[in-house]
Amino acid sequence: MGSKIGFILVIIIIAASFLGTISVAKILYNPSIEDYTVQAQKIFDQAKQKVEQIRNTSLPITNLHVITKAEAVAMWGSPSGSQDLTNIYRQEKIYKGLFLMPENESLYQANQDWTANWGAATVGNDIYVIKENFDPFRMPDAEATFVHELTHVWQPDLQWPATYDQDKAHTALVEGDASYMGDVFMNIAKSQSVPEASVDNVPTYLLGTQLSANVHPMLNTLWDLNYFPYDQGKTFVKTLYEHGGFATINQAYMRGYTPDTTEQIIYPDKYFANETAQPVPAPTLAENNWQLAQTDRGQNHNTYGEHFINIMLANWLNKNTAQQASTGWGGDNFTYYERGSDFLFTWNIKWDTSCDASEFYIAFFNMMNATGAIGDGSCLWTAYGRHIYIDWNQNLNTTLVAVSTVQSAVQPTYFT
């Protein structure tokens, strides 16, 4: 799994497969750490040969490590410093401001829960298996997990993503490729397909089992945001393969061919047509005493993309309405400001047509009413000490969403 604190891809790929390779046999047998490690190393070596054969490549020397769930959370599920913690708290305010998280939930805790679900992880040329979550005696699922992880070892480094949406697109290529390789291995092994578990058609060796009940449950919205690269990414990579085999997949790692938006992942025809995000400006504020906060990627603004919009709307509306209202996304500019203990963020979204802009405007209006926020009857709402505003510029086919702890900062006259 390609992930970082705050759910982003890092330059040194951290890749993981989810809890799901634990079997009843392991629970009853409970092998010693020595037997466990010997078995894991055995199928690890077998999987390495399989990846080299399937991809017609040679993998570098790769080391296998056995760690505990607590060690995994300490390594990848906690902030790396004060700035990282600040970014997590800002992101939590964004999620809550857009009603993606209830007020009593913690994004810090969600990060740890996400890591606690991992079964294996890859960092550079080192692969880690989490003993509580991974059963090397369950075949062929366990070997398929190593095929997934070893694919990450092979994958070339991608250009550093500048935005949230670009990061999700890059991660979809990385995780989609690794998940597709796991499927290729399973087909070669001629194993019986495992019935659908809990997330679309992803094999259970990448999903939680009944043991995941011991893990603090993640919010559906956060799970859907972060599972997108595995689910939709595999479908995207399968489409690449159908257009030219592994050569087309390999080409996608080259600069100029790497997917840049979640829209391209959802609609591969837009990838092949090289339809990228349109540049969108941030609105000018009426006051200049707000401090611009850079993103965790060092940028002055972010882009959240079509998939994020879809998940936000689907949290309150039916899935078909959310999908239809997010289709037609053309680009967006998300800018975050602070002033003392107050915050303001603006989200200027460009749409392909006036109809697309209208559909989102209506869907967002209905979403806000569904949240129980107190509205003024037009385009302003208040909830939990935050004020939310939406505007539709029919001349530019844009919609502006603004959220702030300061009511005067979300008035229509505040933005130009």
What are the residue ranges of the model-derived segments?
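Post-HExxH zinc-binding segment in Zn-dependent metallohydrolases
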Residues: 154-210
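Pan-zinc metallopeptidase signature
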Residues: 217-341, 348
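Short pre-active-site segment immediately N-terminal to the catalytic Zn-binding motif
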Residues: 127-146, 165-170
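C-terminal soluble interaction/assembly domains
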Residues: 341-416
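Secretory targeting signatures
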Residues: 1-31, 51, 416
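Catalytic zinc-binding patch centered on the HExxH motif and its immediate surroundings
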Residues: 73-87, 104-128, 136-137
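Catalytic glutamate of the conserved HExxH
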Residues: 145, 149-153, 157
